[in-house]
Structures are given as structure tokens and as C-alpha cells.
From Swiss-Prot:
Cytochrome P450 involved in brassinosteroids (BRs) inactivation and regulation of BRs homeostasis. Is a multifunctional and multisubstrate enzyme that controls the endogenous bioactive BR content both by direct inactivation of castasterone (CS) and by decreasing the levels of BR precursors. Catalyzes the oxidation of carbon 22 hydroxylated BR intermediates to produce C26 oxidized metabolites. One of its GO terms (molecular function) is iron ion binding. It comes from the Eukaryota. Heme binds at residue 480. Its cofactor is heme. It is a single-pass membrane protein. The lineage of its organism: Eukaryota, Viridiplantae, Streptophyta, Embryophyta, Tracheophyta. Induction: By brassinolide (BL) and dark treatment. This is Cytochrome P450 734A4. Its main location: membrane. The gene is CYP734A4. It comes from Oryza sativa subsp. japonica (Rice).
């Protein structure tokens, strides 16, 4: 009797689980398709389990199989977001796609974007990234939610105040000047010019700045750890390419084992470093410390110090500090490297703007024979600022971002229950295609796919027909905390290089922007650097 009851219970449990699974992967997607279709929102049909992923992968593979046409080098949207470009022509700017059985509503109208990130932000949360992505970016500010995110943001924000970042300028400037001197020597030995893949070399500049910002007086120890993190990123990036292979990250392949070992070593190194700094035993007085005290005043707030001193009532746990350090390294390095890469490529493509930017740099900062650009020079480089903004418009580091509805909500109708809005059920994901908004001719005019920094002459808010048409670092409370550091690094680096070199595209350069988490050149960015003759400063 008891045996029969147990069997019946097991059968009922199995039927219950089967019904839940069937609802999740079949009936719920069908209901949601009908729900959105009833509001005029359509999209490619849902396919059992895989959703639209197969079509998305095919569209992206076809688009990236060939480089950009020379006649329209900056019309990158059809290549970079091929699925969006293709389906938008069929379904309009707001349509429904499926990532497996998960619905994603694409939203590219600025007023709806305003609601998602500003006026209705409490209804949306950042979606949970894939574990491979989280291994790359760390479990820090980028992925945290709720009170923990708010606490971390509050603790770390002083590290990105302008006065604090300005103290990094001499260090970053010397790092870039040293890099430029290496290129000059290579050019002199190579007949007056040198070919450089800036996509690789700029990583060193970005690493220098983010290591200084994160570790301050513990720079040397932090640099060792971050070099391990750079190796880990290479392995994790390869794993990300196989993200659609179920369970791949758990397989004990040689590279996965090396990746796991590096992750453990990084954590041990950061824990030791945090322990020394927390103990205040002076153990971090390495060879860099005296230099930092001489050249970077004691008022500098490095991010590690801010976390250690997070407050007596709510000290940040060591594990949280470790994750934040990983986040700083990934986000700080990749965002700045990509911005610098695309900016130099664009100046090499457009020598007229390169000449305008150089004239401004020489007028404000002097030439390479004088002092390096200072914190007082950087705000005066208006043309360079316009060029960087146009770079971020055409080639934003993150081409899209995703939010998740925490509860049922209405967008576009002025509030829940209002006619004309789109009713969005809880757990629906919303994909905001940043690059598509940046390339929308309705917002930017008929030259939206052309390089024209002059559109930013009156500031970013007035560059387009809508003030929220330019969102390279996101919007609202979760806007990228490090955007000021990225712009400072980019301005300073470009100023130093323009003082010293003329830039041109290498004959081997192939214009092929592509996405692997962030936007980067698929075949690298080889450029020709020709040293300039120093002229007397005015």
C-alpha cells in the first residue's frame, strides 16, 4: 500500500514538473506572443527551446563574413547588430525576439528609453549575465543589485571625482609618452615610420591608468595581480565564443583548468594585498610608494583604499573587494582600449579632423618638445572632445544593454493602465540597442552614418533631435561610474600622440567592427605612425 502511494506521489510530482517545464518552454511563450501581438508588437516566431537564437546566429555570421564596404565605412549597424537591422525593417523599432524561451522586447524609442532608465527605473533591473561573462567582468558594480549595489556605488564614487582623477594625469601622461618614445625609436629604425596595431598597444595605457586608480600606493603589487587578470581574460574570452555549448565552462579542458588556476591565484593575490593594506603594517612601501608620495599628493583616493575604509558600521567584505577589483580591471581596461582604438582609426581615416585636432593640441599644450599635457589643458581641448564623442556615437563600447521587468509595467502610455502604452509582463527582458539609437537618421539627420564631430559643437545634449539619443555609457543611476576616467585617459593619450605623430591607415587595415562582449576591430587596428619634427612652443 505504502509502495503504491509512493509511486503515485512520484508520478504526480513528475507530471507537475513536466507541466511546469512545458509551460515555461511552450505555453508561456505562446501566451506572450499573443499578448504582445494584441498590442501591435510582433517579431520573428518563437521556436521550441531555441527561440530566435538560431536565426540571430545565422544573421550575425553572414554579416561578419565580409568587411565593411569602403564607400560607407561607418554604416556599421547592419554588420554589428545584424539581427536588429534585419528585423527592424520588417517589424519596426519595437519588436519581440526570443533568447531561448525568454522574451526580449527591443526598445529604441528615446522616450521609452527615458522611462526604462529614469522615470520608471524602479520597475527594471539589470539582467543576470551568463556565468562566463561574470567571470570576465567580476561580480562587482556592473552585476550587483539593490542595497548592495547602492552601498558599493556610494563607497566608490569619490574615487571618480574630477579632483581625484586629475591626480592621475601625470602618471598616465608619462606612460603614454614612454609608449610614444618606443614608437618613435621603432620608426627611426624603420625608415621614418612604424606600423602599430593600436588595439594591442593601447591595452598597456589602459592597464596603467586603471591599476593606478584601483591600487594607488600599492601599484606594484596590484600590477602583478592585474597581469594575471589579463591572462584570465584571454581564456574567458575564448570560452565566451563557446557560450552556446551547454556546460562547456565545466569541462576540464586544458584551457579551462588553466583558467580556474589563474582565477584562484588572482583571488589569493588580491586577498593578500587587501590584508596588508587593511592591517596598516606598511608592507606596501615598495619602490613605487615613494614616487607616488612625491608626485601624487596624499589626498588621492584609490579605489581599494575606499573599499577598505568603507565604514565602521558596514565594512565591505574582502570577497566583495576582490570582485570589484576584477570589475574595475575588465571594464576600465576594455572600455578605454576600445575608445582609443576607434578614435585613432577615425583620425587616420579622416586627416582633415586629425589636422584640426592637432592644431588645437599644439595651441593649447605646445609641441612634444615642451611639457606633457596637464589637467588644466584637457578641458580646453574642445575639438578633441567632439571627436571622442563622435567616436562613442559611431562605435560605442557596449552596442546594447538589457534590463528585466521586475513586475508588470506599462511603457509609452504615461503609466500603468493608460491607453496607448505597451503592457510588459514581469520577467520580460528589454533590449536597448544603443548603437541603433546612435545611428538613427530620424534622430541624427541624413549624415547619421558619417563621421562628423561638428555635430557635438554645442554639447552632447544638443547634438541630436532628442537629448537622450546619445547614451554610450548608459543612463540614470547605473550609468558607468568610470566614464570620466575613460574620457580623461582618451583625451590625454590622443593629445600626446597628436603632438608627436602623423597617423595613417596601414595598407593591411581591414575595417570590420564586431562584437565580442564589447565592440572591437575584428582584424586588429594596424596604423602607420610617422614622427613629427618638434617645433618651438608659442
Amino acid at each position: 500500500m505504502m509502495e503504491a502511494v509512493a509511486v503515485a506521489a512520484a508520478v504526480l510530482l513528475l507530471l507537475h514538473v513536466a507541466a511546469r517545464v512545458a509551460d515555461a518552454v511552450w505555453w508561456r511563450p505562446r501566451r506572450l506572443e499573443a499578448h504582445f501581438a494584441g498590442q501591435g508588437v510582433r517579431g520573428p516566431p518563437y521556436r521550441f527551446l531555441v527561440g530566435c537564437v538560431r536565426e540571430m546566429v545565422a544573421l550575425m555570421a553572414e554579416a561578419t563574413a565580409k568587411p565593411m564596404p569602403p564607400a560607407a565605412p561607418h554604416n556599421a549597424l547592419p554588420r554589428v547588430l545584424a539581427f536588429y537591422h534585419y528585423w527592424r525593417k520588417i517589424y519596426g523599432p519595437t519588436f519581440l525576439i526570443w533568447f531561448g524561451p525568454t522574451p526580449r522586447l527591443t526598445v529604441a524609442e528615446p522616450e521609452m528609453v527615458r522611462e526604462i532608465f529614469l522615470t520608471r527605473a524602479e520597475a527594471f533591473d539589470r539582467y543576470e549575465a551568463h556565468p562566463v561573462v561574470r567571470q570576465l567582468e567580476g561580480d562587482g558594480l556592473v552585476s550587483l543589485h539593490g542595497d548592495k549595489w547602492a552601498h558599493h556605488r556610494r563607497v566608490l564614487t569619490p574615487g571618480f571625482y574630477p579632483d581625484n582623477l586629475n591626480r592621475l594625469v601625470p602618471h598616465v601622461g608619462r606612460s603614454v609618452a614612454a609608449l610614444a618614445e618606443r614608437w618613435r625609436a621603432m620608426a627611426c629604425a624603420g625608415g621614418g615610420e612604424v606600423e602599430v596595431d593600436v588595439a594591442e598597444w593601447f591595452q598597456a595605457v589602459a592597464e596603467e591608468a586603471i591599476t593606478r586608480a584601483t591600487f594607488g600606493r600599492s601599484y606594484d603589487s596590484g600590477r602583478v595581480v592585474f597581469r594575471l587578470q589579463a591572462r584570465l581574460m584571454a581564456f574567458a574570452s575564448e570560452a565566451f565564443r563557446k557560450v552556446l555549448v551547454p556546460g562547456y565552462r565545466f569541462l576540464p579542458t586544458k584551457k579551462n583548468r588553466m583558467s580556474w588556476g589563474l582565477d584562484r591565484e588572482i583571488r589569493r593575490g588580491l586577498v593578500r594585498l587587501i590584508g596588508r593594506r587593511s592591517g596598516g603594517d606598511g608592507g606596501e612601501e615598495d619602490e613605487t610608494t615613494t614616487e607616488l608620495k612625491d608626485k601624487q599628493d596624499s589626498g588621492f583616493n584609490d579605489l581599494l583604499g575606499l573599499m577598505i575604509n568603507a565604514g565602521v558600521d558596514r565594512t565591505m567584505p574582502v570577497e566583495d573587494m576582490v570582485e570589484e577589483c576584477k570589475t574595475f580591471f575588465f571594464a576600465g581596461k576594455q572600455t578605454t582600449t576600445n575608445l582609443l582604438t576607434w578614435a585613432t582609426v577615425l583620425l587616420a581615416m579622416h586627416p582633415d579632423w586629425q589636422d584640426r585636432a592637432r592644431r588645437e593640441v599644439l595651441a593649447v599644450c605646445g609641441d612634444a618638445a615642451g611639457e606633457l599635457p596637464t589637467k588644466d589643458h584637457l578641458p580646453k581641448l574642445k575639438t578633441l572632445g567632439m571627436i571622442l564623442n563622435e567616436t562613442l556615437r559611431l562605435y560605442p563600447p557596449a552596442v546594447a544593454t538589457i534590463r528585466r521587468a521586475k513586475f508588470d509595467v506599462t511603457l509609452g502610455g504615461g503609466g500603468d493602465g493608460d491607453a496607448g502604452g505597451i503592457h510588459i509582463p514581469r520577467d520580460t527582458e528589454l533590449l536597448v540597442p544603443i548603437m541603433a539609437i546612435h545611428h538613427d537618421a530620424r534622430l541624427w539627420g541624413p549624415d547619421a552614418a558619417q563621421f562628423n564631430p561638428a555635430r557635438f559643437a554645442s554639447g552632447a545634449a544638443r547634438a541630436a533631435k532628442h537629448p537622450l539619443a546619445f547614451i554610450p555609457f548608459g543612463l540614470g543611476s547605473r550609468m558607468c561610474i568610470g566614464q570620466s576616467l575613460a574620457i580623461l585617459e582618451a583625451k590625454l593619450t590622443m593629445a600626446v600622440l597628436l603632438q608627436r605623430f602623423d597617423l595613417a591607415l596601414s595598407p593591411t587595415y581591414v575595417h570590420a567592427p564586431t562584437v565580442l562582449m564589447l565592440l572591437h576591430p575584428q582584424y586588429g587596428a594596424p596604423l602607420i605612425f610617422r614622427p613629427r619634427q618638434s617645433q618651438p612652443s608659442n
